């Protein structure tokens, strides 16, 4: 499966996908700088993929998004644009981008969320830059399909967790950051922890390995679709 290129190979989903599809070509920032168009061109020239699973992203918690909005917007936008552009230039047959449920409008009241709701409102203000960079990739993919009849798709997972997450209050996903906060409080013998949120937002959670399994099924069956990936259970945070 060397014709399959997986960016973000050392990330949360990438590490699980490697267990399921070990023969794909997994790359990380140590291999290629996806913010450099020349590095991206080099990557495609050397690997010559037929399928691209684009997992790479600049990710972090809410507070880091608030502190570094330009970084989250600009770097994700550049990375996604370069990888998608070179996928087309190198005649990649299938492209699958990974988005995030935070790109949906913040005021959605009905669950499960429908894919048609994507552009029906603004995302949460604290994740504005990251969310719009991811929205841009969805639009970019759809424009390629409309103009050139490509088979490019994206999936939108809910909040993910797993052993390969960053257990860091700044850069971790919600569950990973929460575990780190509780563990730190336990070590420091603190009697309570402070969580942000008033309990009204609803979130869905899924193990990252389940998303990796879905991606592997798409790859092995050569059937790709754009869709949400989530559970039916909602939790208030």
Give the residues covered by each predicted segment:
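Conserved Rossmann-fold NAD(P)-dependent oxidoreductase catalytic core, especially the SDR/UDP-sugar
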Residues: 81-127, 153
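NAD(P)H-binding glycine-rich loop region in Rossmannoid oxidoreductase-like domains
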Residues: 38-77
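Active-site Tyr-X1-5-Lys
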Residues: 124-158, 177-188
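Adenosine-cofactor binding site in Rossmann-like domains, unifying the SAM/SAH pocket
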Residues: 22-42
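Flexible, glycine-rich beta-alpha linker
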Residues: 33, 103-105, 129, 153-177, ...
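Conserved catalytic-site region of short-chain dehydrogenase/reductase
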Residues: 61-62, 97-112, 129-135, 147, ...
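Alpha-helical substrate-binding/gating segment
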Residues: 160-163, 175-193, 203-228
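N-terminal Rossmann NAD(P)H-binding glycine-rich loop of SDR-like oxidoreductase domains
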Residues: 2-21
């Amino acid at each position: 499966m060397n014709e399959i290129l997986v960016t973000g190979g050392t990330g949360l989903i990438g590490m699980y996908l490697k267990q399921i599809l070990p023969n794909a070509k997994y790359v990380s920032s140590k291999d290629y700088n996806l913010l450099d168009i020349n590095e991206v061109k080099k990557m495609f020239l050397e690997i010559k993929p037929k399928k691209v699973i684009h997992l790479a992203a600049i990710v972090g918690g809410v507070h880091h998004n608030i502190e570094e909005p330009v970084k989250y917007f600009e770097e994700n936008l550049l990375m996604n644009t370069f990888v998608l552009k070179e996928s087309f230039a190198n005649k990649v047959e299938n492209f699958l981008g990974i988005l995030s449920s935070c790109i949906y409008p913040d005021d959605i009241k009905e669950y499960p969320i429908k894919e048609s709701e994507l552009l029906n409102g603004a995302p949460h203000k604290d994740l504005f830059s990251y969310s719009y960079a991811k929205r841009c990739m969805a639009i970019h993919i759809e424009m390629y399909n409309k103009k050139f009849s490509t088979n490019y798709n994206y999936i939108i997972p809910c909040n993910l967790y797993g052993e390969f997450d960053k257990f860091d209050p700044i850069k971790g996903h919600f569950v990973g950051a929460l575990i780190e906060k509780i563990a730190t409080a336990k070590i420091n013998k603190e009697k309570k922890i402070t969580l942000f949120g008033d309990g009204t937002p609803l979130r869905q959670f899924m193990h990252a390995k389940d998303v990796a399994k879905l991606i592997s099924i798409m790859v092995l069956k050569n059937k790709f679709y754009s869709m949400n990936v989530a559970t039916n259970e909602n939790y208030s945070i």
